[in-house]
Amino acid sequence: MFGRTLFPARALCSGLFKTPLRTLATRPALSIGGIYPPIATPFTDKEEVDYGKLHENLQKYCSFPFSGFVVQGSNGEYAYLTREERLEVVRRVRQAVPKEKLIMAGSGCESTQATIEMTVEMARSGADVVLVVTPSYYRGKMTSSALVHHYTKVADHSPVPVVLYSVPANTGLDLPVDAVVTLSQHPNIIGLKDSGGDITRIGLIIHKTKHLGFQVLSGSAGFLLAGYSVGAVGGVCALANVLGAQVCELEKLCLNGRWQEAKELQHRLIEPNSAVTRKFGIPGLKQAMDWFGFNGGKCRSPLLPLTEQEIKELRHIFTVNGWLSS
């Protein structure tokens, strides 16, 4: 990746983008700094979206100093929801939370046209920003050129700002650095959520784009401190669904330069974060939510609940790090 020649971005972009390139004088008006939980989607026993339990979760989350909410991200099981369900969840969240809470809605689809249509509809449903995951079904053909073309088309047609989303654990595809640098010059692409955890890569992207006001969010609480240390403006953290106050405290410590305290807190969040993401996934996240007073519940098929042994292991991880009593 790092040995690849970067696009001559300004020359390339001038022929791609419908609107003028972002410059030092045209920094984004919208800040996406802060902590965002990528909210889970509760389901009934019949695997229908439980909007009542969603509303209850949101009322509790509004007591935390989150900057906003990511709706229909990976933790929202968006891949298992219908088009109308995806839009209705956005509408319900917008209605339930204060206007100052930013709604970042996942509008990514596999085709460019479908992504544009979903983006427009999500904006109409109340999204302030859209989070667009990399298309990946034909990942072997998802070159930098293909991805720049895709995101440029989406951003040109989006009525709200666009945040790029790289999540290689789910897509098998890292949004290339050269593509990010090129796309950072589009006036309607304001940032990147990077869930890969490669701090060298994140630092390089920030170094190459910060003069444009491009904003990078860490995609996990597991490397939130590291992200802040290289210039990230915040994080989209699954663990914030469970330990919202603690993740926000870590943000505060980092922003205030209290690095020793931040390091100690970060250490206690690493294992729980890994447990509710890569190790046990959304079933683990929802189980932990239940323990901490939120509505997690079951997942939509084909995701299965944790086994009894997995539940014991998950609880042990939270216990040894001081978040649950034994």
UniProtKB/Swiss-Prot annotation:
MF (Gene Ontology): (4S)-4-hydroxy-2-oxoglutarate aldolase activity; (R,S)-4-hydroxy-2-oxoglutarate aldolase activity; 4-hydroxy-tetrahydrodipicolinate synthase activity
Subcellular locations according to the entry: Mitochondrion
UniProt binding sites for substrate: S74, N75, S195, G219
Pfam families on file: DHDPS
Activation/inhibition comment: Inhibited by divalent cations.
One GO location term (cellular component): mitochondrion
InterPro entries: Aldolase_TIM (IPR013785), DapA-like (IPR002220), Schiff_base-form_aldolases_AS (IPR020625)
Major location category of this protein: mitochondrion
Keywords: Lyase, Mitochondrion, Schiff base, Transit peptide
Subunit structure: Homotetramer.
Protein name: 4-hydroxy-2-oxoglutarate aldolase, mitochondrial
Organism: Xenopus laevis
